[in-house]
Amino acid sequence: MLLSDRDLAAEIKAGTLALEPFDPALVQPSSIDVRLDKLFRVFNNHLYTHIDPSRQQDDLTSAVEVPDGEPFVLHPGEFVLASTLEVISLGDQLAGRLEGKSSLGRLGLLTHSTAGFIDPGFSGHVTLELSNVANLPIMLWPGMKIGQLCIFRLCSPAEHPYGSAVYGSRYQGQRGPTPSRSWQSWRTWPTR
């Protein structure tokens, strides 16, 4: 069940949903707007001939911190990692979905490629996968609204929420945009 504004307020008051920093003015009818942090990870395309998710490629991205009062310029066709300003923490009976903002989508900004789902028990900054599909550069200002967080209540609490020892939870407590750690639990399954 998708939570409404009054449900979101109740979960925040109960401590089962937390955003830090939190601004009540960002609560919408069925979501909470989240803002862009000033940390980005850009791809070092000149260092690799390809990306292999089964291998550790530490130099694939480099951290960039945007100076106060300056934008990050995302050029057409570029893909970068960024993160929410807010640390988002979900209880074991809540799951989240990060969606883009319609106004930014209409300018050609994609907020996430595939990873918009947030598991119950997660706590940390949410990594954004930003792409510019427009024909002009897009100025990304730290502190601007970048997405909206939708919260869903599970039918029952997760038996093993994110952050528990069962799953490893590679991104629990992440600060800023975190590069892929797919290689840490890489495996393939038979195709026949």
Swiss-Prot record:
Uppermost EC category: hydrolase
Residues holding dCTP: K101, S102, S103, L104, G105, R106, D119, T127, L128, E129, Q148, Y162, Q174
SUPFAM superfamilies per record: dUTPase-like
An MF annotation (GO) of this entry: dCTP deaminase activity
Biased segments, Polar residues type: 171-192
Keyword Hydrolase belongs to the record: yes
Catalytic-site annotation from UniProt: E129
UniProt-listed Enzyme Commission number(s): 3.5.4.30
Reaction catalysis annotation: dCTP + 2 H2O = dUMP + NH4(+) + diphosphate
Keywords, alphabetical: Hydrolase, Nucleotide metabolism, Nucleotide-binding
Pathway recorded for this protein: Pyrimidine metabolism; dUMP biosynthesis; dUMP from dCTP: step 1/1
Example GO biological process: nucleobase-containing small molecule interconversion
Region span, Disordered: 169-192
Domain of life, source organism: Bacteria
Site residues by UniProt (Important for bifunctional activity): G116, F117
Biological role stated in the UniProt entry: Bifunctional enzyme that catalyzes both the deamination of dCTP to dUTP and the hydrolysis of dUTP to dUMP without releasing the toxic dUTP intermediate.
Assembly description: Homotrimer.
Family: Belongs to the dCTP deaminase family.
Name this protein carries in UniProt: dCTP deaminase, dUMP-forming
Organism this protein belongs to: Salinispora tropica (strain ATCC BAA-916 / DSM 44818 / JCM 13857 / NBRC 105044 / CNB-440)
